[in-house]
Every structure is written in structure tokens, then in C-alpha cells.
Amino acid sequence: MRTREVLNQARDLLDDLNTFPVPNFNTGANLANSWTMAANVAKTLSPSLHPAEFMAALSRGVAKFPYGSVGIFLASGFAACAEAWGDIPVVRPADLLMAIDTMDQSFKEVAGADSWEFGLSHLISNISEQLSELELLTLTQVVDTALVCAQEATVDSADAHGGVGDAGLAGACLIFAALADLAAVAEGEAGVHVSTVQAMLRDWANRSRIVAESLRHTVPGGEFATTFHFEAVDMTTEKLRESLRAVSSEVLVCQIVDEFGVGHFVAHLHTPAPLTALPYSHGAVLIRHLNVLPEILEGDEDPLTKLTADFDNVVVLADFTARQTPLVAPGLLVLSSAPALVETYARAGATVLLGMDNPHQIGWAWHTLPTGRASLIVPTSSQSHQQALMMRDSLAATGSVDACVIVADTQDELSAAWLVQSLQGKRFRGALSEQARDLETACQDLRARIRVEPMSGQNLRTQIRDFANDLGSNRELHAVISSENASTDRMNLQLALSDYDDIELVAYYGGQPGVTCIGVRF
């Protein structure tokens, strides 16, 4: 619980740092969310469990809804502890060394042949090497050694990257510091490690701010971060990784054994082709585009150029300061079932939960959105709309979410696609409640300019004629074709439009469950 509090306090600090080799400024949120998931699982477990059973349960909990690469490593680390400890009733310092050795091998399997010189896998190897040189092991010695190794790796990473270190390593420093404080208190000492590490990281982040901001605004290409579960018979971790590596720049894979002894793969990829990279059979997929949506400051005019006899200095500077309130992009989450629209959503700045098979996955996906801004959940069916409302209310009841989460009234893929595209580039300012109010108003205005209907099977020509009366100057009719009747519906639409030489059919092929949707924008 203490570690969860420490990581939640530091999430913004860690988000301001970088994760190498790909610029990725969400490590703080991913670490905090992953550890919160583990803490929530821990609260449901019996105190009489053996350490291995406890760690195995934590591993399954984190792997069920992993947050980025750090979630993969954390789940793998818990699983390694469970594997190392077996049936021992109490963990001794020497058993911690055994767990770290197992974790060393596990992390190498997660990352495969990828060489992360300053990454978490390299860190665990160093910790294992340092601990092997100790003759007498105490709990404090083990954790303090891990903390020193993490601090050294963080500093080395910063030296190697122009002053900006690896946020994952910085997070490891905080985790080990929290554990070191617990060990110190257990042995009758004062716990000061967390405050020391927080001060170190804060000072380091402040000094590297200029370099970090430059990296933050460097878009790492047209890649997508993709996280998914996968089940396979007679499939090794290495074999799965190799099959994914052909279309991915970064591949992390771990295998988690459930309470029934069945192995499940969890993978996190950076890939330019998220759908091509996926295995044939997989569960829900969480996808976001690795772009950067920077804050914008309104008014870039130098106020000093306005200082004449007609202006009061204080008033002018105060006005300029007020106009410098940052404009921020809202967090967008789309609950989609249309693979063909995934890139459309993601390139417009939305996180996409594709193929949701568990309503609780909405909460998992929502927690990946940036903090400190209003967020919008965009359903694409009546079922996902109802599930989104229920999940929002459930999160609110537990204090996990405030009134700044809005659920759009979209209930089809076409309306969702148009809404997300229309919100692309829009920024909002002010407190969260003000952002939410303005975002909700913008959604209502945009939805008023969208008309979408299920395609009529009996009176399609009449329906097209009615649509034609509403078409704007672009004279475009759009459609999301049903996956069940794709060829037939596309042909029927084209035949019905043959009477209108000046109307173009623009179809999003790939479809949605259920009936085909057609619509126009005003």
C-alpha cells in the first residue's frame, strides 16, 4: 500500500521523464496504475497464503489488465517470485536473492534479444550480481543493494541521454525506496529513503526539463502501442516473440499461468501495423498512436511591445499571464468493434479498446488516458454505451473517477468515427470541471451535425432520397458496412446511388457488428 501511495504521488514527475528507446511519456501513470491494480488484488487475499501463492495472485491481477511495458515487467516479476519461492511459508533474505535470480531470467525472456543497456532487465542483472558478492544477507542489505543499483542505473541512463534518464528506472528507484523504508521500520530504523529519492528525482527532472521537453515534442514515427492477451497450445514465448518481431520495433511478451495451470501470453508491441501484427486468435486489444499532443499556450505576443503610455504595466502583464492558460487535448477512449476504423480513431488521438469481451476492460483502458484533463468515452453500440455508463458510475462510487468523465451518446461506429475526427485538434482550458463542461457542449454541437441510420432493407431508395435532401455541398454519403453482409450491403448501396450522379458513396470497409450504418454530416 505504501508503494502504491509513493508511485501515485510521483506519477506526474515520472511522466515528465522519458522511456528509452522510444519517447513515451506515460511511464508514471502506467507504474501507478499497475501497482494500484496489485494493491487492489492484495486486499482480497487471505493473510494465511504462502508467499508464492500471494505473488502468483498479484501476477495474474496485473497481467489481466497490463499498463504498458512496465505492467508486463511487473507481472513477470511477481510471477518470478512465485516460481522461486514454491512452498516456503516465510520469505527470508536469502529467498529474496533466489527470487531476483529467477527474475533475472524472466526479464530476459520478456525482452528477448532486445538489448536495453539501461533498462529494467539490465538493472535486475546488476542487482543479482551485486547481491551474490554479499556474505551475510539481511532484509535491509538486500533492499538497500537493489536501491543503490537502481540509482546508479538511473544516473548512468541520464548521462547517456543528454541528462534525461529512463523513467522506468526512476520508478524502480521509488519502488525499492518504499520497500527499503518498510525494511528499515521492521528493523527499528527510520525510513528516509523515499523522501531522499523523491528529492533526487525532482532535482534531476528540473535540471533536464529543456531536454525532456524537446524529446516530448519528437514524434517517434507512425507507430502504435498495442497490448493484448493471447492463448496458444504448444507455443513458446520466444516463438511468439519472433512471429511478432517482423512487424514491430519493440516486443515484450510474458506468459502467466492462471489458477488452473493454463498459460496465457500477454504482449506489448510498438508497431506501425497494429492489426497485421496480431496473432489470429486474441482477446481484447488496447491500441494508441505514439504521437504527442502538446499543450498550447494562447497568445504568443510579447507584452513588452505593448507597454506605452496608454497601458498600465501591471494590467498588461496580468492580462498576458491570464491568456497563457494552457489549452489541453481531452482524453478520448473508443470502445470499438470495427478493425478497419482502428487507425482512424488512433491517428485522431484516441485510445482504442478493440473487441471488448469484459466490461471491466473499460476501466483498464480509461486509466491509460492522460491525467489532469477531461476525458470522453465513445461507445459504438447500444451495449457498449450501457456498459460505459455502468463502469463510469462504478468508478465514481469507488472514488476512482470524478465528474470529468463524459460518455458520448454514440451507438454506432460511423457516429463515433465522425465525433473523434471532429474533436481532433480541439483543445480546452481551465479546471477539470470547466474542461468537461466545454467538452460536453462540443460533443452535443458535433452530434447535432451528424445523421446516421441503419440501412433500410425494404425502402433503401426512399431512404437515399431523403438523405439526398439533407446532403451538403460535398454530396457525400458515408457508410460503415456490416461484417455479416459486407458484399451484399455494399452492392445494394451502389445500386441505390446509381440514380444520383452527383452523390458519392464513401464507405469505411471492415464493418461493424449488426446492421450497416449510413449517414451524412451537415
PLM features: residue spans?
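N-terminal loops that bind phosphate or other acidic moieties
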Residues: 1-522
